[in-house]
Swiss-Prot record:
The keyword Membrane does not apply. It catalyses: (1S,2R)-1-C-(indol-3-yl)glycerol 3-phosphate + L-serine = D-glyceraldehyde 3-phosphate + L-tryptophan + H2O. The lineage of its organism: Bacteria, Pseudomonadati, Pseudomonadota, Alphaproteobacteria, Hyphomicrobiales. This is Tryptophan synthase alpha chain. Its EC number is 4.2.1.20. SUPFAM superfamilies: Ribulose-phoshate binding barrel (SSF51366). It is an enzyme of class 4 (lyase). One of its GO terms (cellular component) is cytosol. InterPro entries: Aldolase_TIM, RibuloseP-bd_barrel, Trp_synthase_alpha_AS, Trp_synthase_suA. The gene is trpA.
Amino acid sequence: MTTRIDRRMAKLKTEGRPALVTYFMGGDPDYDTSLSIMKALPGAGSDIIELGMPFSDPMADGPAIQAAGLRALKGGQTLVKTLKMASEFRAGDNETPIVLMGYYNPIYIYGVDRFLKDALASGIDGLIVVDLPPEMDEELCIPALKAGINFIRLATPTTDDKRLPKVLQNTSGFVYYVSMTGITGSALADTGKVAAAVNRIKGHTDLPVCVGFGVKTAEQARVIGANADGVVVGTAIVNAVANVLGPKGEKTADPAEAVATLVSGLAQGVRSARLAAAE
C-alpha cells in the first residue's frame, strides 16, 4: 500500500529536488488561526506538513515549540481538535501528506485503536512519536503500519551502525535525521557531517532521508537540501507565529501570512538545492 508520503517523495525524486517538510503546532495560538496556517502551507511551497500535537511535557522540544504547545493547550487544543483540523484541511486538499508529530501519552490516553481509526478517517498519512523507541513497536508502530499509516523514526548523530538497523526496522515513509543532539531549535549542525550521516543512513535503507533541527533560512535549506531527500523546518515557523503575537497573545499581524512568507523563501532555497549541488 502506498501512502501520500510515498507518492509525494517518489514524485519529487523524479523532479530531482528535495522535499520541504514544514512543522507547525496544532492550535497555536488558536484553532481557527492554526487551521488558516495549515491551509496556507501548500500554496507557499510546503511538500509535506508536520502537524504538532501539543503536550504538557514536551521533553525533546526547545523553548519556542514548548511555548507554542502551551499557547495551544491554553487555547483549548486537544487531540480530538487536532484530528478535526486535519480533516478540515483534507476537505480542500487531498494530496498534501500530513504527518502527526508529538508524544505518546495523548495517544495512549485516547486509545491506540480508536486513535488509528480516527487518524485514518481524518486523512493522516504518517506519525512521528518522539518518545517511543523501537523496543516498543508493538504499542503503536506495528498497529499503525497495519492500518496503512507510515511510522517515521528519528535517527541522530549518536545512532551508531549497531543501533541503526533496529531504528530502521519498521520505519516507513521517510527517515527523519535529527542533525544534532539536544532539543529542537538549536544551532545548525556542520553541513559536511550532515551529508556524511545521510549517506551512512542510506547505506542501511532505501527510504528517503529528511534532515531537520536548526534550519531557519533559505540558504540553510539550500545547503542541507543538496545532500538530503527533504529539509524539515519547525522552530523557524513556530517563531514566525510567535513574532506576530503581542504580550497577551493578541495578533499584531496575520500569522498565516507571516508563515507563508517564510515558507515561500524556504521553498525557493530547497528548489535551488540540487541546481547548486550540480554546479
